[in-house]
Each structure stands twice: as C-alpha cells, then as structure tokens.
C-alpha cells in the first residue's frame, strides 16, 4: 500500500534537519518505489541538471537513473566545458540554469556547505532553484546516508539497539559524518575504529572509539570507509601510508569475516579499495551489501527528488 506520509522540502542538503519521522517516511517511500509502486503523475515537464565538480560514477549515475524513472528531463552539464573554468561562480551558474528553465540542480562540490550561498544568498535576491546536495567536501552526503539507512532497515527492520561500527578514514568522510549523526538519532549504538589520527574527539558525542578486533564479533553492521587520499595533501600520515599494513590492522579479511555475527552485514559507500578496506574475495560475499546499497540508492534518490518536487510544488505535486 502506498505510504501517504510524504516528505516535502524546498531543498535537500543535509540529513541533520530531517526529523526521525521524515527519515522513516523517505525509507518507506523508497521501498514503495523499489517494490514497483507507481511514480507521481507530473502535470508539466520538469528539468533537472547534475552538476558534479568532483569525480563520481555511482552517485551521478544513480541520480540520473532516479530522475529518468520519475520522468524528469535531464539537462547535461559538464564542468570541464563550462564557464566555471572562466571564473564563473557557482551562484552565477545556478542563476543561469534557473533563467533557462532548470527547476532543480543536483550538485557535488569540494567546498563544505557550498549550498549555503545558494539557498540563503546574503547579497542576492533572485535565485530560486531547488538544490539537492550530492556531497559537499568532507561535510555531508545525505543521499548516501539515506540509502544506507534503507539498506539497514531492509535487513534488520529496525535501528534501535543495533550495533554499528564506522571504520576507516572518518575525519575526511562526509558519509561518516552524515551516518553517525542519523544513526545516533535513530537509536543505534555507534562505534568507531580505524587510525586514531583520522579520528576526532568531536565524534565522541555519537559513539565510542575501539580497536577493530574488540568490535568485530559484537557488531551488527560494519560500515567501512574508503581511505580518501585526495583529501590528504597536507596530512603527514599520507606519505607513510602502507595499504598492506592498513588492511592487516583495519580491514575486513577472511579471518575477521568468520568472526562476524551470523546476521551481520558489511557496508561500503564505494569505491572499494580491494585488499585495503576489504579483501577482494569478500566484495561479493553474502554479508557484503555493496551492490545492494547501489541498487537501493536509485529508489532513495527518487524519494528525495520527489520530496523537493513537492516542496517546490512542481509538476502539480504538493
């Protein structure tokens, strides 16, 4: 049966401003779409563009698939051949997109909270275009967070009391920041592990840091993070990084896999560094949800886009 508790938002930039009820409604809506539920009947053409200023394959492709499944018209945008390379600001690019008729922008950008000047412009009055955050620097990744919540809910049917370990390059991960905050609010017990130099005491309010081998047999969810070498330009630990040593100390190998609880799952936002965060032979193992996460991402992003369509009263939705 179709869920009637539909979320309505003018923009979708963070999970921190979502209520638990809205998160649950988005999960229900995404599951509805996954189970073959009808997409909303749009009464007018809707135009959307994907503006990815950082490399992406999964998120970009997933958003475009979601957009096409909803019946939206996708306007191509290639930063490498745009006026951004001539010094045009993101605000001015967005102003132009609105002027030519684009209704919503999906943006990934290296700057944390790039969206603030687009949704709350201090020196401008005219920009009025929907913004969906596809990742901002090391800040937030709301769509990855919500597809992760959907995947966990699909497997366990609940969040309260689940033990979830977030392991790896936590400080530089926007996925970790979004997930730890929301998992905590949903009632899960959050734990952290990985190199201590990539951990910050500011995360203590969400969970507890432990050595991986002390956690492995107790966790319901092992959430592995990619080592983000591209964000380590000023990090002295980058020069001494040893992939084999990292895998031995912080990766899921065959031995640790055998120690997992029978119903435990392994998650990873991708791309996976084989034999670093996870042994190559375990990527398609029964407990690894990597491809399930990607599959669920399309349906969660459909729910997110629909929420912005409703929030902006586009296509006859409200």
UniProtKB/Swiss-Prot annotation:
Annotated keywords: Pyrimidine biosynthesis, Transferase
Positions annotated to bind carbamoyl phosphate: 58-59, 108, 141, 144, 270-271
InterPro entries named in the record: Asp/Orn_carbamoyltranf_P-bd, Asp/Orn_carbamoylTrfase, Asp/Orn_carbamoylTrfase_sf, Asp_carbamoyltransf, Asp_carbamoyltransf_Asp/Orn-bd
Enzymatic reactions: carbamoyl phosphate + L-aspartate = N-carbamoyl-L-aspartate + phosphate + H(+)
A cellular component term, taken from the record's GO annotations: cytosol
EC number of this enzyme: 2.1.3.2
Pathway the protein acts in: Pyrimidine metabolism; UMP biosynthesis via de novo pathway; (S)-dihydroorotate from bicarbonate: step 2/3
Claim: Endoplasmic reticulum is one of the keywords in the record: no
Membrane-crossing residue ranges in chain numbering: none
GO MF assignments: amino acid binding; aspartate carbamoyltransferase activity
Gene Ontology BP, a term: amino acid metabolic process
Primary enzyme class: transferase
Keyword Transferase assigned: yes
Binding site for L-aspartate: 86, 174, 226
NCBIfam families associated with the record: asp_carb_tr, PRK00856.1
Subunit structure: Heterododecamer (2C3:3R2) of six catalytic PyrB chains organized as two trimers (C3), and six regulatory PyrI chains organized as three dimers (R2).
Record PANTHER family: ASPARTATE CARBAMOYLTRANSFERASE (PTHR45753:SF6), ORNITHINE CARBAMOYLTRANSFERASE, MITOCHONDRIAL (PTHR45753)
Function: Catalyzes the condensation of carbamoyl phosphate and aspartate to form carbamoyl aspartate and inorganic phosphate, the committed step in the de novo pyrimidine nucleotide biosynthesis pathway.
Family statement: Belongs to the aspartate/ornithine carbamoyltransferase superfamily. ATCase family.
Protein name per its UniProtKB record: Aspartate carbamoyltransferase catalytic subunit
Organism: Lactobacillus johnsonii (strain CNCM I-12250 / La1 / NCC 533)
This protein's encoding gene: pyrB
